[in-house]
Amino acid sequence: MQGVIAFLFVFSIIVIIHEFGHYYFAKKAGILVREFAIGMGPKIFQVRKGETVYTLRLLPIGGYVRMAGHDEDEQEIKPGMMITIVLDSENVVQKLNFDDKIIIENSVPFQIEDADLHKDMTLTGYFINSEEKVTLSVSKTATIIESDGTEVVVAPVERQFNSATLWNRIKTNAAGPMNNFILSILVFIIVGFMQGGVPTNDAIIGQVTNDSEAFVAGLKEGDKVLSIDG
């Protein structure tokens, strides 16, 4: 059991350091990082700082970074879906809630007909008890509460991975393996220091204590034994 726990711990550390490389360079490039997750599976804790939500998930197996437009699983939006939205004083959408277990103060029910949350930043549909179709503007800093309760920021096209320069995309993709390479070098150096030097088969005197027979005989640390009883 201890071996399994040790494996999961080490594997998670490796994956987290790998993903941090992607996270750091994506942030530097202006790519929207929606989520930095530790673990996999169902979410058990989340905290949002700025435009990134940091989550702790149930299964202690690695982690991942969700970059906008880079192989991420977005919230599915279908015509006819009933959600709740939060509007500001100018009727601009500031929050879209797809989790029916979460109740938000000052939110209003809305039935979706169409949504473009990348280019036009619009939401089309009907308010409850109304047959008038309306098209609302969506703020570029609006948030989406996904069906599992994770709250992420919308991803305008200019903040997506493919909108970054080629060089920034290369750096972001390569940063994960680069971090693992640096980690392996650091671990190698640390292990080397912990071993206390390079193993050798030479008969060389190590530490000599003051009350030992070797000390009385005049042996010193570093002396090389040439023969015994010779």
Question: What is the meaning of each model-derived region?
Answer:
Residues M1-F7, K171-N173, P177-G197, N201, ...:
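Protein maturation boundaries and topogenic segments
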Residues Q2-G3, R159, G230:
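C-terminal recognition in membrane/secretory proteostasis and scaffolding
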Residues G3-S89, I102-V152:
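Small-residue-rich helix-interface/hinge motifs
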Residues T52, V157, N201-I204, E221:
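Envelope-exposed proteins and targeting segments
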Residues Q94-K95:
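An N-terminal, globular interaction/scaffold subdomain
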Residues A142-I185, I189:
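Interdomain regulatory linker/hinge segments that flank or connect interaction modules
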